[in-house]
């Protein structure tokens, strides 16, 4: 669910790689890079691996394919688990993103496509977010549905752009 590698010049590349259900990609499936508990654990493990690698100076997060950085949490996974599991899933995801945010190495989110919902929350945990022109939508659509972003996205957004801009 996460491809991890280190380039010759010390960049740890963490590539999110899943279909719309959050399952591993198979032939013919579109990479939407939604995350499940398993992927979030893989992200957490990759972040820790990069942190402890003295040869790594930069961590770069990206999504597999050209259309999505990440479409956020897998709705099918969230629909199939208990409220208690959802609570601990969101808690672990928030802890993982906080760990990413507090990593003393430079963290770059390379937005290669849409970054919505939890996908944007992952990107906001990076030090720098970059994307190509017209690469896709960026937003927290759950807020317009009256749902609080599950991994601290509203708080991260207001810290990044200020409260007034975040309210827009």
What residue ranges belong to the model's regions?
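Hydrophobic/aromatic residues within transmembrane alpha-helices
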Residues: 43, 61, 74, 122-124
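Conserved CoA-thioester-binding segment of acyl-CoA-metabolizing enzymes
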Residues: 1-62, 98
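Structured loop/turn residues at beta-strand edges in well-structured enzyme cores
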Residues: 9, 54-56, 73, 102, ...
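Crotonase-fold acyl-CoA enzyme core
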Residues: 101-168
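An acidic, glycine-rich surface segment that forms the CoA-thioester-binding/catalytic face
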Residues: 40-44, 51-52, 75-112
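Short beta-strand/turn micro-motifs composed of small residues
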Residues: 62-63, 111
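Glycine- (often His-adjacent) and acidic-residue-rich active-site loop
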Residues: 18-23, 27-30, 63-96, 146
